[in-house]
């Protein structure tokens, strides 16, 4: 970016008189700076290991959207999208500016959010920490040198983990603050080193801008494409297997977390992956394992300080250990980040109750119902301040924490896309079988991969099915390469009466949760849920 443009954009946010500003450094120099500044250390595999302190996940209670004329009407205000007064945000921004001006060094990354030039955002990220600049460089899409010369930011993200907010003085919930101002086009992140806040804040921005300004459907999903051009989408919350299942050596990865679906096809918002790596092994997830090398960031992963060997099984810091790396580290990843319309759409859920079938075929109405329901399990450590190890939860559209607009807006966009392009839809349970969490076992990843391959190949559509008596789902009687005994969840429980009781309880939870959507959906969708 031209220095005059940089100066003008930052001064427009009240930021001036900075110390040394390091712009768009390559990974090696950012790693070097991180080690020099003692922000992290190198592991034996070459990755940079950084710790985030007590905030080892997102801080949803501390996320706000500035209420103004642009957001007052369309935003779905509530516990997820909490309003924040513009004048208070101005004061916090001034605090952040003063804080930045007192730092000896600041790291700035210019990047794209969105692989399709028609819809992408130019994002300028200003970081207190060099390792967060490395994270940003590897996770966002990287402009060429020529593009950087002409780069002008649409949005600015300011990440100052060392600035702790004061609830009494600043009107925040805690010392942490994540605020989005759609008027000034700025994101302010204070009091947390968890780097996922940077990427998810811009995801929230895209989830507002793309539907309202471009008619593009934003999705919390991973995506891959086969040699024949057949595209598959994988929806699901953190820990349900989006990254794992879309990283298939027989297919080409488009992206692991955030995509848009336009009239021309799908496109990745990002240029990298942010994979959970608790219990990671080369045997189970070879692509992810091999992508963790020099230039990658390991977040809250335990490392032996003497040997520098990584222990992916150690959850003493958090279950939410993460690896951030660029897509180019995945062999066969789609460089363009773009592909055609999806043939198969998969909803992933980690069912903590252990009662949902491992695979179900969804009608268009059921697709809308289960998309709006967004049922999964909130696994330990994917958010800060969690009280239970596992908590069953409903997160609309498999991404409620990141959706500024009403959930029914996104569901209507999905239904329209499925109708227009004839995409098939499935529900995949990557959670528990044979009992609830703590009693049953997690569905084997190898079996889940076989189910996914059968779905993509179209083999499921030719299989005979039975109707699940509790949820009305069509469940295949057989799937190639998968033991038929696990396809009927009731048969995997030693105590069938206990299964019936647990299934009825979950069905009740679905019905209770869906009441808030009933007035905003067609009758067919209202009737597509559990039938007991």
Curated annotation (Swiss-Prot):
- InterPro entries cross-referenced by the UniProt entry: PEP_carboxykinase_ATP, PEP_carboxykinase_C, PEP_carboxykinase_N, PEPCK_ATP_CS
Q: What is its EC number?
A: 4.1.1.49
Please tell me where substrate binds in this chain: 58, 194, 200, 322
CDD domains, A to Z: PEPCK_ATP (cd00484)
Q: Which residues form a coiled coil?
A: none
Cofactor(s) the record lists: Mn(2+)
* Keyword set, alphabetical order: ATP-binding, Cytoplasm, Decarboxylase, Gluconeogenesis, Lyase, Manganese, Metal-binding, Nucleotide-binding
GO BP terms: namely:
gluconeogenesis
Which residues are involved in binding Mn(2+)? 200, 220, 257
Q: Which Gene3D superfamilies does the UniProt record give? A: 3.90.228.20, Phosphoenolpyruvate Carboxykinase, domain 1, Phosphoenolpyruvate Carboxykinase, domain 2
Which residues are involved in binding ATP? 200, 220, 236-244, 285, 322, 442-443, 448
For molecular function, the Gene Ontology terms on record are: ATP binding; metal ion binding; phosphoenolpyruvate carboxykinase (ATP) activity
Catalytic activity entry: oxaloacetate + ATP = phosphoenolpyruvate + ADP + CO2
Q: Where in the cell is it found?
A: Cytoplasm
- One Pfam match, given by its short name, reads PEPCK_ATP
Answer yes or no on keyword Heme. Answer: no
| Cellular component annotations (GO), alphabetically ordered | cytosol
Q: Which EC class is this protein assigned?
A: lyase
Q: In which pathway does it act?
A: Carbohydrate biosynthesis; gluconeogenesis
**Its domain of life?**
Bacteria
Family stated for the protein in its record: Belongs to the phosphoenolpyruvate carboxykinase (ATP) family.
PANTHER family in the cross-refs? PHOSPHOENOLPYRUVATE CARBOXYKINASE (ATP), PHOSPHOENOLPYRUVATE CARBOXYKINASE ATP
What NCBIfam families does the record point to? pckA, PRK09344.1-2, PRK09344.1-3
**What name has this protein been given in UniProt?**
Phosphoenolpyruvate carboxykinase (ATP)
Question: Which species does the entry assign this protein to?
Answer: Rubrobacter xylanophilus (strain DSM 9941 / JCM 11954 / NBRC 16129 / PRD-1)
Encoding gene per record: pckA
């Amino acid at each position: 970016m031209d220095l005059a443009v940089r100066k003008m954009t930052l001064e427009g946010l009240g930021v001036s008189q900075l110390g040394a500003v390091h712009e768009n450094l390559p990974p090696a120099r950012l790693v070097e700076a991180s080690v020099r500044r003692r922000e992290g250390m190198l592991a034996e595999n070459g990755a940079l290991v950084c710790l985030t302190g007590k905030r080892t996940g997102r801080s949803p209670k501390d996320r706000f959207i500035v209420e103004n004329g642009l957001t007052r009407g369309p935003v779905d205000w509530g516990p997820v999208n909490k309003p924040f007064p513009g004048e208070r945000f101005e004061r916090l921004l001034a605090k952040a500016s003063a804080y930045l001006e007192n730092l000896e060094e600041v790291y700035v990354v210019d990047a794209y959010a969105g692989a399709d030039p028609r819809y992408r955002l130019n994002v300028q990220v200003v970081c207190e920490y060099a390792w967060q600049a490395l994270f940003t460089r590897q996770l966002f899409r990287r402009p060429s040198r020529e593009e950087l010369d002409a780069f002008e930011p649409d949005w600015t993200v300011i990440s100052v983990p060392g600035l702790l907010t004061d609830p009494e003085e600043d009107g925040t919930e805690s010392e942490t603050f994540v605020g989005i101002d759609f008027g000034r086009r700025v994101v302010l992140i204070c009091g947390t080193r968890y780097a996922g806040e940077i990427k998810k804040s811009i995801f929230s921005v895209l989830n507002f801008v793309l539907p309202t300004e471009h008619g593009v459907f934003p999705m919390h999903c991973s995506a891959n494409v086969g040699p024949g051009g057949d595209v598959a989408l994988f929806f699901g919350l953190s820990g349900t297997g989006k990254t794992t299942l879309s990283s298939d050596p027989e297919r080409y990865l488009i992206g692991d977390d955030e995509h848009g679906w336009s009239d021309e096809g799908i496109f990745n918002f990002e240029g990298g992956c942010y994979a959970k790596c608790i219990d990671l092994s080369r045997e189970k997830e070879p692509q992810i394992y091999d992508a963790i090398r020099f230039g990658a960031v390991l977040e809250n992963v335990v490392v032996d300080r003497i040997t520098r060997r990584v222990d992916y099984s150690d959850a003493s810091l958090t279950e939410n250990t993460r690896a951030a790396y660029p897509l180019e580290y995945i062999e066969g990843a789609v460089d363009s980040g773009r592909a055609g319309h999806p043939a198969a759409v998969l909803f992933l859920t980690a069912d903590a109750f252990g009662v949902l079938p491992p695979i179900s075929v969804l009608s268009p109405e059921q697709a809308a119902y289960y998309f709006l329901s967004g049922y999964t399990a909130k696994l330990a450590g994917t958010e800060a301040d969690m009280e239970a190890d596992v908590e069953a939860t409903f997160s609309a559209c498999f991404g409620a924490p990141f959706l500024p607009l009403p959930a029914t807006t996104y569901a209507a966009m999905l239904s329209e896309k499925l109708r227009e392009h004839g995409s098939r839809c499935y529900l995949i349970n990557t959670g528990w079988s044979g009992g609830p969490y703590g009693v049953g076992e997690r569905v084997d990843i190898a079996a889940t991969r076989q189910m996914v391959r059968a779905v993509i190949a179209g083999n499921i559509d030719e299989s005979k099915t039975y109707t699940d008596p509790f949820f009305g789902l069509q469940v295949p009687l057989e799937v190639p390469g998968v033991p038929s005994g696990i396809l009927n969840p009731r048969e995997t429980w030693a105590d069938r009466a206990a299964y019936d009781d647990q299934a009825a309880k979950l069905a009740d939870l679905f019905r209770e949760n869906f009441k808030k959507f009933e007035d905003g959906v067609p009758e067919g969708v209202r009737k597509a849920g559990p039938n007991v």
